[in-house]
From Swiss-Prot:
Belongs to the peptidase M20B family. The lineage of its organism: Bacteria, Bacillati, Bacillota, Bacilli, Lactobacillales. This is Peptidase T. PROSITE patterns: ARGE_DAPE_CPG2_1 (PS00758), ARGE_DAPE_CPG2_2 (PS00759). Zn(2+) 1 binds at residues 81, 143, 201. The keyword Acetylation does not apply.
Length: 413
């Protein structure tokens, strides 16, 4: 194995349950995330990182790999998130499959679940590689503990294995609650103090992402008028029916299951209620600013039209922006994309530069003034029991970070 401690680190990290809690009012959202951040801080100190500190204000643990060159080069930040998605993360029991043949069905522990190339054709890309997968009862946590392990392995390499590898100052940060969309809300750009950064939070080999969705959330309250159904004619207003009518007024094909690429959507996350009152929760996504604003306006227009027809204000939307397409920031200086692309090409990795149908912590951090695109970390089928990662892809992620650092030495600050 190229980096001896990369896999052991990853296996250690994924066994810790750091599932974030969207219903929490604290930062981080769970005590487990606080404890894991402190554990990472101790590990960072053990590797030799300097100025390691935990920020109570946002749950991030930060450390520094000091420069070992006199060149005036740009300071690089590397970020990954410690939390995992909303799927069972208790008792993660990673399974290791060496020299996968690229075609066999992989049994997930003792469960009835399998990784079948017929269902997951991406498996065919991993012939001859070592895969880490789940036992079928939990997620794996490669999102984003692959990124955490890769950054820690990079730090170990620079500080202990090959301390003569020339580099400028590198700052490392691990934070909470990315999966519930609030992890970067309180990120401290001034404390991190770098010229540019990358989140190591992408998927398969070669992913390089700087264009995200712009995102908003919408909560629609429906006020009905409930009377006995036997005498309801011309009197009852069923709030649940209002919710159905509202949803049906949205474009039928603008849904996640019917869109791809640069196409945006409305996604109904939750609908509950009674004839008296109901509540629908949506997310709104689009890459283009104009279309994003049009989607938000449409949700208000539908409510206004329904209220006019009802003669009463019974449909009440509240729409709040969540994050914006970070391409608006990064396209002002594409050098950090160019250097990452060049690093991959130097390593015979084909860069995959496509819009993210989602967001990253970098979306918010970029709008705070720190351009932060996203690099691959290796995970596939993330957020569930079918998640897996290739050890060789994780190694190439470390290689890519090292090559970015090497190329950065050639760019004067």
């Amino acid at each position: 194995m190229k980096y001896e401690k990369l896999l052991p680190r990853f296996l250690e990290y994924v066994k810790v349950n750091t599932r974030s809690d969207e219903n929490s009012t604290t930062t981080p959202s769970t005590q487990a995330l606080v404890e894991f951040a402190h554990k990472m801080g101790e590990d960072m100190k053990a590797l030799g990182l300097k100025d390691v500190h935990y920020l109570e204000s946002n749950g991030y643990v930060i450390g520094t790999i000091p420069a070992n060159t006199d060149k005036k080069v740009r300071k690089i930040g590397l970020l990954a998130h410690l939390d995992t998605a909303d799927f069972n993360a208790e008792g993660v029991n990673p399974q290791i499959l060496e020299n996968y043949d690229g075609e066999s069905v992989i049994q997930l522990g003792d469960t009835e679940f399998t990784l079948d190339p017929k269902d997951f054709p991406n498996l065919k890309n991993y012939k001859g590689q070592t895969l880490v997968h789940t036992d079928g009862t939990t997620l794996l946590g490669s999102d984003d503990k692959s990124g955490v392990a890769e950054i820690m392995t990079l730090a170990d390499y620079l500080l202990n294995i090959n301390p003569d590898f020339e580099h400028g100052e590198i700052r490392v940060g691990f934070g909470p609650d990315e999966e519930i969309g609030v992890g970067a809300d309180k990120f401290d750009v001034a404390d991190f103090d770098v010229d540019f950064a990358y989140t190591v939070d992408g998927g398969p080999l070669g992913e390089l992402q700087y264009e995200t969705f712009s995102a908003a959330g919408a909560v629609i309250e429906f006020q009905g008028k409930n009377v006995h159904p036997g005498t309801a004619k011309n009197m009852m207003v069923n709030a649940l029916q209002l919710a159905i009518d509202y949803h049906n007024a949205l474009p039928e094909f603008d849904r996640p299951e019917k869109t791809e690429g640069r196409e945006g959507f409305f996604h109904l996350l939750k609908l509950d209620g009674t004839p008296e009152e109901a509540r629908a929760q949506y997310i709104i996504r689009d890459h283009e600013e104009g279309k994003f604003n049009e989607r938000k306006a449409l949700m208000q227009e539908i409510a206004d039209k329904m209220n006019a027809e009802l003669g009463q204000n019974r449909v009440k939307p509240v729409i709040k922006d969540q994050y914006y397409n970070m391409a608006q920031i990064i396209e002002k200086d594409m050098s950090i994309i160019d250097i990452a692309k060049k690093a991959m090409e130097n390593l015979d990795i084909a860069p995959i530069i496509e819009p993210i149908r989602g967001g990253t912590d970098g979306s918010k951090i970029s709008f705070m003034g720190l351009p932060t695109p996203n690099l691959f970390a290796g995970g596939e089928n993330m957020h569930g029991r079918f998640e897996f990662v290739s050890v060789q892809t994780m190694e190439k992620a470390v290689d890519t970070l090292l090559e970015i650092i090497r190329l950065n030495n050639e760019v004067a600050k």
